Swiss-Prot record:
The keyword ATP-binding does not apply. The gene is strG. It comes from Streptomyces griseus. Keywords: Antibiotic biosynthesis, Streptomycin biosynthesis. GO terms for biological process: streptomycin biosynthetic process. SUPFAM superfamilies: Clavaminate synthase-like. Pathway: Antibiotic biosynthesis; streptomycin biosynthesis. The keyword Cell cycle does not apply. This is Streptomycin biosynthesis protein StrG. It comes from the Bacteria. May be involved in the formation of N-methyl-L-glucosamine.
Amino acid sequence: MAKYTRLRYDVTEVPLADLVREVMGEEDLEGLAASDRVATRETDQSTPYHRRFYDNVDVISPVYRTLVHRLLGDEVDAVYIQRIPTFRVHLRNSVAVGSWHRDRDFGHDPSEVNYWVPLTRAYGNNTLWIDEEPVHAEYGEVIVFDGANSWHGNVVNDTETSRVSMDFRTLPRSSYEPNDRKSISYGLPFRLGEYWDTV
């Protein structure tokens, strides 16, 4: 059985989905058009939806940081957070992440903790899988898991809805070691002020 913790937050106080709908210019995130091809590791971050999200990260960042404060509470001063959250779109007939992986296989520190934040319903084959188990979640829930060391990924979405989510990682400040390895999603070095930040 996959190991994870389920947290909840108030979506009226941290309206992430509303903000993402606004910056993407999309009324219905679950209704995003089906894909005509299955994404790969090289293409899973290159849809027009991703461009709109990352082009507006300065608008999203304050609400993202509010979420981090709500989730971490007093622990926020003991960790570094991923400066720019990773955006995921699991379109129908495609995948959100091009390959099953453990984050450590891509240069991430083994002591990192992953926070997966669905902005739509996540169920059936449109959801995140951890250690070969689908993790169902609703908007307003956050799944916390050991993505550095646990196999995770997804399968082709054969549901009737697209899934939109974001995720981020934390790193204990005591484990931080500056290095020049780069994140696979957007090529940022795993350094403070680049990939990592304080809240």
